[in-house]
Design a protein with these regions (language model features):
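Core catalytic alpha/beta fold that binds nucleotide/phospho-ligands
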Residues: 1-160
Length: 160
């Protein structure tokens, strides 16, 4: 069994003054990447995700956050150099989620289901025929939440 720590953060609760102070905790590469993000909400998510990740990993490893070195893998997923901690970040709507573990690769996904859209065409296109049939068999009022639950699980597996 895999044991992981999950952290939820609502980025909108962090005020502008705190965001300015937190920028100094980014590495030079992280700062450059953060600065290149043009959409303010995405910029806030990136900053807070990286700071949360650095602080929590540093706490577990007994080192300062700026001592952590990350490398980007061939598929763009960052990894921690020289340590066995695994992590994954996701965001949707007003929420940011971080998962940490030492037992192997993990993925996490959060979907708030805020977009009101017909989910059956998406399910027919992206899900296996058995999954699509399962979704069709549900009462119509349950289909949207079931769609997003399955979508999140699939996304988390792919991110691992």
């Amino acid at each position: 069994m895999l044991y992981a720590d999950l952290y939820l953060l609502k980025p909108a609760l962090i005020d502008a003054e705190q965001l300015i102070r937190l920028q100094s905790e980014l590495s030079p590469d992280e700062y450059r990447h953060w600065h290149e993000i043009r959409q303010p909400g995405r910029q806030r998510e990136y900053l807070l995700g990286r700071i949360l990740l650095r602080r929590l990993l540093a706490e577990r490893l007994g080192c300062p956050p700026d001592a952590l070195v990350f490398r980007t893998g061939e598929h763009g997923k960052p990894t921690l150099v020289s340590h066995d901690w695994q992590f994954n970040l996701s965001h949707s709507g007003d929420w940011l989620v971080l998962a940490l573990c030492q037992q192997g690769p993990l993925g996490v996904d959060v979907e708030m289901g805020l977009r009101q859209r017909p989910v059956l065409p998406l399910a027919q296109r992206f899900y296996a025929p058995e999954e699509y049939q399962w979704l069709l068999a549900l009462p119509s009022r349950a289909q949207t939440s079931a769609f997003y639950r399955l979508w999140s699980r699939k996304e988390a597996v792919l991110k691992a």
